Amino acid sequence: MEEHDIRMALDRHWAASAAGDQVVEHEIYQDHAVCTYPQSGEVIYGRHNLQALRSHHPGKPSGFEVRRITGEGNVWVTEYVIDYAGESVYTVSLMEFVDGQVSRETQYFSNAFDAPAWRAQWVGREG
């Protein structure tokens, strides 16, 4: 699959995710795809389980913003923010493609936090 085609598939995937379209969102995954959440130690085996897990999430997102997609060849990274009941969850998704579909995904999640005062002299602020 060409990089342009992968990028189009990713755009479709994230748009479907933002819209809550579970069927289209999960078309990007191979049937035997594996998704890991390193922070919790969880591994989700197979597209069916991944779609079921996401379909049963107790909090529906109130916002979804893709900040950046970058990649080359078969490895792509997406940075995005999901809002759950006013809480922003900053997310990084690493996807590995085989035969045009995601075979492996790793996702990292972090809530927003206040910047420590001691760093103020060396940093700027977004926004």
Feature roles, as predicted:
Residues N49, I82, Y108-S110:
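Residue-level structural signal for beta-strand termini and adjacent loop
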Residues M1-D31, A120-G127:
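Short, low-complexity N-terminal intrinsically disordered segments enriched in polar/charged residues
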Residues V92-V123:
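Short beta-strand edge/turn micro-motifs at domain boundaries
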Residues S62-F64, E87-L94:
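Short, surface-exposed coil-to-beta transition loops
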Residues V77-A85:
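Short beta-strand segments that buttress and anchor functional surface loops
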Residues E3-D5, Q22-G73, D114:
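A solvent-exposed, acidic/Ser-Thr-rich amphipathic alpha-helical stretch
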Residues H13, E25-H26, A33, G46, ...:
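Hydrophobic pocket/interface hotspot
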